[in-house]
């Protein structure tokens, strides 16, 4: 008596396994997070207004006084600041006499920090993690440039949003998503007065002090900016003098070529 061949059963088993795998993948895809619902129209309008204001910014040049207090250590610099959208900046901290004390230049692909008296320079990638090393905040360079220009980049891919009634600062828009929660207070012209991030990588608050009127900038540039992390470990204040916006300066001005003879530490 012949024993029936088991090959058809194996084929059937393989087919069942394939079907089970396909079903598992299909169910897994169905179980993924659904797309976020659209924001309420009034919230989306405010989000777009913030984004459009940032996109309309070109450049800024100004004398600046920058004070930094981090974990009990204080530093103060006076110098010249250049900003160019989307992610370029240059700051030269000037000494009363002689060469600059410090030069920081950031581009979309690289950050260069040159400690002039020490004859040392550091090259870092222009990433949030690298910016944490010198700035103390894991901010994208584009977000840093936006804040220094008096703008706020609205939270990317928000999953919910709310317009909040005015408090002692003004009305505000709150956006929440995977990056945390961002709340931005606005003046009657829709310009940010204060922004606060919570529940993300950089819980902090930034306050903009805007002039009542400024014919040179149309009030788009704040007179002063104060940044503080919510844990109090970092405080930064920036005060501008004679700012000028959208002058169309040469982009080469924000680049920094470290001269020969300077010790370079490359962390890229």
Question: How would you label these PLM feature ranges?
Answer:
Residues 53-60, 72-75, 82-87, 213-219:
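Edge/loop elements at the starts and ends of beta-strands within beta-rich repeat scaffolds
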Residues 160-268:
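Gly/Pro-enriched, hydrophobic low-complexity segments
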Residues 30-76, 266-268:
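N-terminal leader/targeting segments and the immediate start of mature chains
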Residues 66, 85-87, 93-97, 108-110, ...:
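A mature extracytoplasmic/lumenal domain signature
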Residues 1-30:
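Sec-dependent bacterial lipoprotein signal peptides
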Residues 149-151:
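Scaffold/interface architecture of coatomer-like assemblies
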Residues 87-143:
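An acidic-aromatic
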């Amino acid at each position: 008596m012949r024993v029936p061949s088991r090959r058809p059963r194996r084929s059937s088993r393989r087919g069942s396994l394939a079907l089970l795998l396909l079903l598992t993948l299909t169910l897994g895809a169905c179980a993924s997070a659904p797309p976020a619902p659209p924001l309420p129209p009034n919230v989306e309008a405010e989000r777009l207004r913030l984004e459009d204001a940032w996109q309309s910014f070109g450049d800024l040049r100004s004398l600046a006084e920058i004070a930094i207090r981090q974990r009990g250590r204080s530093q103060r610099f006076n110098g010249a600041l250049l900003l160019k959208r989307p992610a370029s900046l240059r700051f030269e901290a000037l000494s009363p006499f002689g060469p600059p004390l410090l030069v920081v230049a950031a581009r979309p692909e690289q950050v260069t920090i040159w400690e002039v008296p020490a004859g040392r320079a550091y090259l870092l990638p222009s990433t949030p993690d690298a910016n944490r090393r010198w700035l103390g905040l894991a901010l994208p360079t584009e977000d840093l440039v936006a804040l220094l220009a008096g703008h706020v980049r609205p939270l990317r891919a928000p999953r919910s949003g709310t317009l909040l009634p005015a408090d002692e600062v003004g009305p505000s828009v709150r956006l929440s998503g995977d990056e945390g929660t961002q709340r931005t207070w606005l003046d009657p012209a829709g310009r940010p007065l204060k922004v606060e991030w919570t529940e993300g990588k950089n819980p902090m608050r930034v306050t903009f002090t805007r002039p009542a009127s400024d014919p040179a900038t149309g009030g788009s540039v704040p007179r002063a900016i104060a940044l503080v992390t919510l844990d109090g470990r970092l405080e930064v204040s920036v005060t501008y003098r004679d700012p000028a916006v959208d002058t169309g300066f040469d982009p080469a001005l924000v680049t920094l070529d470290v001269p020969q003879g300077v010790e370079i530490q490359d962390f890229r």
